[in-house]
């Protein structure tokens, strides 16, 4: 009988330690605790007003014009061209145009 009493006492003490609220507040009505945070309020999203920023212009940098250095190119020698001498004929006869009578200067049929 002593072992039963001892085991029930250990069980009762273990229940008191393990249950965080304990048995004293079991029969009491729950106490109202207000919420830490307020109720959610539906607010329309606030749009930030656009800030007008003028475009930033880069300051012009003055660079003096740079001339390219002269390039040395060797002179190109063209091979000599051998053309036969052009012989002009003494009688230069031109053909009359089609459908026209030859003028007296070009008429060689006297």
UniProtKB/Swiss-Prot annotation:
Statement: the UniProt record of this protein carries the keyword Secreted: yes
Entry annotated with the keyword Signal: yes
Signal sequence range: 1-24
Keywords: Cell wall, Nodulation, Repeat, Secreted, Signal
Annotated family: Belongs to the plant proline-rich protein superfamily. ENOD12 family.
InterPro entries referenced in this protein's UniProt entry, alphabetically: Proline-rich_CW_protein
Compartment(s) of residence: Secreted, Cell wall
Membrane-spanning residues: none
Protein name: Early nodulin-12A
Main function: Involved in the infection process during the plant-rhizobium interaction.
GO biological process: nodulation
Assigned GO CC terms: extracellular region
Spans of repeat Sequence: 34-38, 39-43, 44-48, 49-53, 54-58, 59-63, 64-68, 69-73, 74-78, 79-83, 84-88
